[in-house]
């Protein structure tokens, strides 16, 4: 595949639920009515390169991960299978996976949603001090995603800043499940596993090829957040102790994702997420009910619609009772509530 021009996805579409895909028995469908137009490079990882594209049909941006080495095809299909069964607001959403022929070459391409504010590595490169409140908000969302994965007996095995993506509205997306492992039973959950991941963020038990479980992801999470805490004077002792607990040498001493969510520092924030179920009579909930079924794949478009709907409600219900500034403040408050609704509901 070239790195410019239009990408036609009409040759093969792989069924992510079928692990027997090959040239002869792939599940296929004709999707020639949609093409992806190349915008720019988006990075390169172990599996292959990634590009940013736009759909000529919907004008929505996506990321396409292109895997060209045949020995990595199986891993790519496994990643697609996992993304297909992982429907969670804090996990990157898959659109499709397909094979593309280019002369004598074949690539497996995974199309996923585009996070419009880069990844946490980009935030590190900006070399700005991230405040504790923001780090806690990120940590909470990542733990929502990890808790979901671990309950499905899925280990990510490569948590690091480059694999945690961010949207401009603050929503976190865990991505790159290429090294992930679906554990089929409790015995396998406790077995010795393969040496995988990025060494800097790798747990001691994985480095030493010992038995490991979900706590290996917790260790990697702790190392990720330590990268943001070079100036420890900016953070509370409670926060520093929480992050320190994630990188304990013994896995049994590390908290689970659910235990992190129940930490006093995060519990109040978590409650704010969960309290959306009690917002049945709020203006924000009425807006949410009105727009939740709209097929908006771009979250910026979603929030623009929310803002427009909020203005309509304000005009209908309050008319001249509030100033424009007061209205704007309420819009921002409702956007926060709706942000939580997207994650929880």
Label each PLM-derived region with a short phrase.
Residues 191-205:
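Conserved activation segment of eukaryotic-like protein kinases, specifically the C-terminal portion
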Residues 93-106:
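Short beta-strand micro-motifs within the conserved protein kinase catalytic domain, predominantly
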Residues 39-46, 50:
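Protein kinase glycine-rich loop
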Residues 105-119:
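Conserved short submotifs of the Hanks-type protein kinase catalytic core
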Residues 150-166:
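Catalytic-loop of the protein kinase fold
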Residues 217:
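Conserved catalytic-loop aspartate of Hanks-type protein kinases
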Residues 138-139:
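Activation segment signature within eukaryotic-like protein kinase domains
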């Amino acid at each position: 595949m070239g790195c410019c021009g239009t990408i036609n996805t009409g040759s093969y579409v792989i069924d992510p639920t079928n692990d027997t895909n090959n040239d002869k028995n792939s599940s296929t469908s004709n999707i020639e009515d949609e093409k992806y137009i190349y915008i720019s490079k988006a990075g390169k990882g172990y599996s292959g390169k990634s590009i940013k594209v736009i759909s000529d049909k919907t004008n929505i941006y996506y990321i396409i991960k292109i895997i060209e080495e045949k020995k990595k095809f199986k891993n790519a299909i496994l990643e697609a299978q996992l993304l297909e069964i992982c429907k969670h607001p804090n996990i990157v959403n898959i659109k499709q996976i397909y094979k593309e022929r280019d002369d004598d070459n074949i690539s497996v391409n995974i199309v996923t949603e585009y996070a419009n504010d880069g990844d946490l590595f980009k935030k590190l490169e900006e070399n700005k001090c991230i405040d504790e409140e923001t780090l806690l908000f990120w940590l909470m969302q990542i733990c929502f995603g990890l808790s979901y994965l671990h309950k499905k007996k899925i280990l990510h095995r490569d948590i690091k800043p480059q694999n945690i993506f961010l949207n401009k509205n603050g929503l976190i997306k865990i991505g790159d499940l290429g090294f992930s492992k679906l554990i089929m039973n409790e015995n396998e959950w406790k077995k010795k596993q393969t040496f995988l991941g990025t060494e800097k963020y790798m747990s001691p038990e994985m480095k030493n090829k010992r038995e490991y479980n979900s706590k290996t992801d917790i260790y990697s999470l702790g190392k990720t957040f330590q990268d943001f805490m070079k100036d420890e004077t900016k953070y509370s002792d409670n926060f520093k102790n929480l992050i320190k607990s994630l990188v304990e040498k013994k896995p049994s001493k590390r908290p689970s994702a659910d235990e992190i969510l129940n930490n006093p520092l995060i519990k109040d924030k978590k409650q704010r997420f969960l309290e959306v179920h009690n917002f049945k009579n709020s203006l924000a909930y009425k807006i949410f009910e009105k727009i939740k079924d709209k097929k908006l794949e771009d979250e910026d478009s979603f929030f623009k619609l929310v803002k427009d709907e909020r203005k309509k409600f304000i005009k209908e219900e309050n008319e001249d009772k509030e100033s424009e500034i007061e209205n704007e403040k309420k819009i921002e408050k409702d956007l926060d509530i709706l942000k939580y609704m997207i994650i929880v509901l």
